[in-house]
Design a protein with these regions (language model features):
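Basic amphipathic alpha-helical segments that dock to polyanions
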Residues: 61-72
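Short acidic, hydrophobic short linear motifs in intrinsically disordered regions
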Residues: 46-53
Length: 144
């Protein structure tokens, strides 16, 4: 597990708030970082670094994503098979279909209830930040 999983999430509901958060953590806000923030806030689904990069250098995008993750703005997650993806931490947990790969964000209230159930059953304070809750979507469940 990465050390970023232990980082407290930074609440930033806009690019401007994210810029302020980066500066508050002593990070410079360069034009490539601002462009990357714009892409993250525009994305409705978690994105690969390659998709976020566009015409930018992918290695630079990875370095900037690591910086964003270190201050709690972004998280790296795996949604089933395929490359890792990045999403804003405040966008919550995800569920993914093991058969077709479709994924959806989970409502915060549902995740809170799930965490309580896991804690009651096991004593474990479960986190759903890095991996999705896996299952079959309705279409794939009908096929299998």
């Amino acid at each position: 597990m990465s050390t970023a999983a232990a980082v407290r999430p930074t609440r930033a509901t806009s690019v401007g708030a994210a810029v302020d958060a980066l500066r508050a953590h002593g990070l410079r806000v360069t034009n490539p970082r601002r462009v990357l923030l714009d892409a993250l806030y525009a994305a409705e689904q978690p994105q690969t670094a390659e998709a976020l990069a566009g015409d930018a250098d992918v290695a630079s995008v990875y370095r900037n994503l690591d910086a964003f993750e270190s201050v709690g703005l972004v998280r790296h997650l795996h949604l089933g098979h395929g490359p890792g993806r990045y999403a804003l931490r405040e966008r919550g947990a995800w569920a993914a279909c093991e058969a077709c790969g479709r994924h959806a964000s989970l409502p915060a209230a549902a995740v809170t209830r799930l965490r309580l159930l896991v804690r009651e059953a096991t004593g474990l304070d479960a986190g759903f930040d890095h991996f999705p809750i896996l299952g079959l979507c309705p279409e794939c469940a009908n096929v299998h």
